[in-house]
Design a protein with these regions (language model features):
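C-terminal motif of bacterial Sec signal peptides marking the signal peptidase cleavage site
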Residues: 15-18
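GH16 jelly-roll
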Residues: 23-199
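Sec-dependent signal peptide recognition
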Residues: 3-12
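Intrinsically disordered, low-complexity segments
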Residues: 2, 20-25
Length: 199
C-alpha cells in the first residue's frame, strides 16, 4: 500500500532549525553542497528568509505538556520559542518555571518548559521525492530535536497505522549521533520492531 505523507509534517521538536545562539555551539558557517543531479524538479521549498512563518505552508502548534510522547514542555506560538534570526528559523526550548497558558482546545495548563513546534499538515503532502534539509542542532541532555513525516491519514487511522518516517532525531546526550526510523502498523516502537539506523 502506498501512503502519501504530510511532507514536513516535520515536527520540529525541540530547539533549533537553521541557526542557534548558544555560546557553546560550534561555528555558524553552513556549507551548502553543489547540486549534483539536475534530474529533480523543485516543487516546494522553504528558505525561512522572511520575518515570519508563511501561514500558507506552516501550522504553529499549541499543545499542553504530555500531549505528545509524554513530553514535559508545552508547545507555544510565542516569538520567544519560535522566531527568525540572521536569516534562519530558530525553534528554542526554554526553562520557564510556572509558565501558564491554554492549549488550542482552550484547556489551561502549567509547565516549567516551553518550546516551538510546526508542521505542514493539510498544506503539503507528497508520496515520492527527494527532501533536502539543512538544520543546526543543539547538544545537551534533555534536548530532542526531530524532523518527521507522518501519513496524511493520521487523523482518521491514527498512529502507527498512518506510517511515520523519522528523517532525523537527535537525543541530546548522544553528541554526534543522528537516528532515522520507519514506523508502520507492523514495525513500530510500541512493539519494539521499528526499523532504525544511526550515524
Amino acid at each position: 500500500m502506498v501512503r502519501s505523507f504530510n511532507f514536513l509534517n516535520f515536527i520540529f521538536l525541540v530547539i533549533i532549525f537553521g541557526c542557534g545562539d548558544s555560546e557553546s555551539e560550534s561555528s555558524n558557517d553552513i556549507v551548502i553542497p553543489e547540486e549534483s543531479d539536475s534530474t529533480w524538479n523543485l516543487i516546494w521549498n522553504e528558505e525561512f528568509s522572511g520575518q515570519e512563518l508563511d501561514n500558507s505552508k506552516w501550522n504553529i502548534l499549541r499543545w499542553r505538556p504530555g500531549w505528545v510522547n509524554n513530553e514535559l514542555q508545552a508547545y507555544t506560538n510565542r516569538d520567544t520559542n519560535l522566531y527568525f534570526k540572521d536569516g534562519c528559523l530558530v525553534i528554542r526550548a526554554l526553562v520557564e518555571p510556572g509558565y501558564f497558558d491554554e492549549d488550542y482546545l482552550g484547556n489551561s495548563y502549567n509547565s516549567d518548559y516551553t518550546s516551538g513546534r510546526i508542521n505542514t499538515a493539510g498544506k503539503f503532502n507528497k508520496t515520492y521525492g527527494r527532501y533536502d534539509i539543512r538544520a543546526k542542532l543543539p547538544k545537551g541532555r534533555g534536548s530532542w530535536p526531530a524532523i518527521w513525516m507522518l501519513g496524511e491519514n493520521i487523523s482518521t487511522d491514527g498512529w502507527p497505522y498512518c506510517g511515520e518516517i523519522d528523517i532525523m532525531e537527535h537525543v541530546g546526550y548522544e553528541d554526534d549521533i543522528i537516528h532515522g526510523s520507519i514506523h508502520t502498523e507492523t514495525f513500530n516502537h510500541n512493539l519494539n520492531t521499528q526499523k532504525s539506523g544511526s550515524k
